[in-house]
Regions:
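Alpha-helical residues within the helix-turn-helix
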Residues: 27-29
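Amphipathic helix-loop-helix modules that constitute alpha-helical solenoid scaffolds
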Residues: 1-6, 13-16, 22, 31-176
Length: 176
């Protein structure tokens, strides 16, 4: 909601909808855990105090807010791609959810933008390497040492498809 700061929107969304912990959000945003906890509490209080209603934005507002939504989807994916806490190095369920959310956005003509397509391509390319990113001992494997035969070719093809769609425009964005 636009009456809440951008950072607070990110924090609320990652916490409430993404299910991330305050620690994970602080790592994601490169901020102190205490600062994130306070910002989360303030944003929740503001939401309740002002009785903010969540309504579907107008077409003009969708365009303005899409960049923030894509950033949140990216941050959710990023936390899954390299988990900041817990035993798992990769949390595939977060990555799958980020991809699902991005695909839902693309179903809307207003959200089917080069940025949204480029972000989905990026997520598919990264997801294609899951099977090669962790070795038998559970350690992270750098890109240069990954067994490329373990890369998921179908996900690479999906990535190429969305990269092609993103490239139909000359617009430069954060994900291409």
């Amino acid at each position: 909601h636009p009456s809440i700061s951008s950072e607070s929107q990110i924090i609320l969304t990652l916490k409430i909808l993404g299910g991330l912990s305050i620690r994970e959000i602080s790592t994601t945003l490169l901020k102190k855990e205490e600062a994130i906890a306070k910002a989360y509490t303030r944003a929740k209080k503001k939401f309740k105090a002002e009785e903010i209603q969540l309504v579907l934005p107008s077409a003009n507002e969708v365009e303005k807010r899409l960049e923030m939504v894509l950033k949140i989807v990216y941050l959710l994916f990023n936390e899954g791609y390299k988990s900041s806490e817990g035993e798992q190095l990769i949390r595939e369920e977060l990555c799958i959810e980020a991809i699902r959310l991005n695909k839902v956005l693309l179903e809307s003509a207003l959200c089917n933008t080069p940025s949204a397509n480029a972000l989905l391509a990026l997520m598919y390319f990264h997801s294609s390497r899951f099977n090669a990113r962790v070795d038998e001992q559970g350690e992270m494997v750098s890109l240069e040492h990954q067994d490329r035969s373990k890369w998921d070719q179908q996900l690479i093809q999906e990535g190429l498809h969305y990269l092609s769609k993103a490239s139909e425009s000359d617009d430069v964005n954060d994900y291409i």
